[in-house]
């Protein structure tokens, strides 16, 4: 188990719950964390992100149906931290979209070390990617969420939205679930099927 100090704003109870989540985590090298059977090379920023948000990801980023053997489109893949999260929860394949060039080598090393069935896309998200074959999309890439406003349907997804105006427009257009957070909003289509726009657009990007 990894013991870390309480993060700012956490109660003692929050800290204990996070310790419970990390019961099978351990540092295997200075910058490598083992979670279950996976080993992730991380920067200090991504280690803190894993520690602070893994427990929340279970509420934000998992659909109510099984991901066993499914393909996840991970927009804003970072160093592979959310890919690890999805493999840990049964995903069979991840398409990792991460345009930040400095993260590419780290993401590739994590893929190779864990022998993940992964495709790495080192360019910015474009809504044409929604024509690819996948079962669920996670998006955390500031600014990309506005591209979803022009869609006729929204795939099964969890989208982190960084401004309220966009969150309101997406909720009005698609009638998706909204989980308000302190500084952002998590929009979810928990269905196994795309949700059609209320505006009846003929544009339809399915994720079959």
Locations of the language-model features?
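Active-site segment flanking the S-adenosylmethionine/decSAM binding pocket
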Residues: 75-79, 121-167
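Residues at the starts of beta-strands that form the adenosine-phosphate
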Residues: 92-93, 117, 156
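Conserved SAM/SAH-binding beta-strand->alpha-helix loop
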Residues: 100
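Short, conserved SAM-binding/catalytic segment
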Residues: 107-118
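General small-molecule cofactor/ligand-binding pocket signal
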Residues: 119-121, 177-179
């Amino acid at each position: 188990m990894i013991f870390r100090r309480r993060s700012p704003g956490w109660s003692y109870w929050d800290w204990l719950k996070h310790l419970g989540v990390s019961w099978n985590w351990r540092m295997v090298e200075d910058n490598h964390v083992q979670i279950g059977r996976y080993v992730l090379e991380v920067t200090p920023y991504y280690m803190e992100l894993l520690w602070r948000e893994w427990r929340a990801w279970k509420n934000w980023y998992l659909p109510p149906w099984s991901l066993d053997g499914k393909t996840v489109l991970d927009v804003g893949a970072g160093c592979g931290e959310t890919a690890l999260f999805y493999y840990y929860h049964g995903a069979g394949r991840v398409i990792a979209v991460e345009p930040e060039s400095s993260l590419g080598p780290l993401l590739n090393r994590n893929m190779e070390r864990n022998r993940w069935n992964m495709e790495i896309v080192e360019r910015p998200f474009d809504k044409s990617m929604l024509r690819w074959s996948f079962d669920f999309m996670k998006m955390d890439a500031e600014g990309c969420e506005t591209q979803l406003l022009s869609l006729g349907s929204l795939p099964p997804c969890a989208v982190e939205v960084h401004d309220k105006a966009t969150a309101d427009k997406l909720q009005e257009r698609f009638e998706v679930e909204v989980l308000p957070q302190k500084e952002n909003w998590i929009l979810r289509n928990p269905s196994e099927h795309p949700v059609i726009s209320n505006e009846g657009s003929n544009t339809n990007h399915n994720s079959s």
